[in-house]
Amino acid sequence: MNRKYRKTVIAGNWKMNMLASEIKPFMEELKENLPKTRTCEMVLCTPAVMIPAMVKAGKDCKVAAGGQDVSKYEKGAYTGEVSASQLADIGAKYCIVGHSERRQYHGEDDMLINAKAKALLEKGIMPIICVGESLEQREMDLTMEYVAYQVKAALSGIDASQLRRCVIAYEPIWAIGTGKTATAEQAQEVCEGIRAVIRGIYGARPARAVSILYCGSMNAKNAQELLAQPDIDGGLIGGASLKPVDFATIVKATDQD
């Protein structure tokens, strides 16, 4: 993995799992299994109500706290929403936007995802912007056409200085929560394509510096092969991030230089 120009990020997405009371024992077990030295940045994205507990428990392991979604609005009469300033106030350093589950179950479109990413950047939170194709789109050979459109839409109006604080996560929708995984070659091909799209917008240097993660059933068994690919700079981990030993194993897999 080439770490010369960009950081490696291993981020967990706990989705609607775990309790705040379970975070401390989780972190204690994680610490026991982590390597003494590591070059990657670790993030755990929890439901918003659990972020303060993650901030507190994560300090010892140097795990950053992240959110799973954010409102495009700064404040107001938006019942149930959480703003970027509220996330920042409780210690979130990262936040996922555009996850396929948000797109599917909540009807989120690219314009909304772009607005959310901008809201996060304004408050100093790094957005993890998810893009990816369905099985139908892959079978129709439309993967890069669709993913390129998502990338361009998500980054619309974001300048090169802001791009440096963005992370892109490629999530083949057909591999989310299904146990199916894109081959390392398939994942690399799309991540390389994403970097090419960014290069076309911002130029070679900014594109070279963007961290691109793979999000599609990465686990302790396949992480090393996926993370060895030149354009995969980490992972956005679902189920495996709920298991301290497995998450630590994925972190160890980043040390391949």
Residue ranges and their predicted role:
Residues M1-D257:
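Active-site loop-to-helix "anion-binding N-cap" substructures in soluble metabolic enzymes
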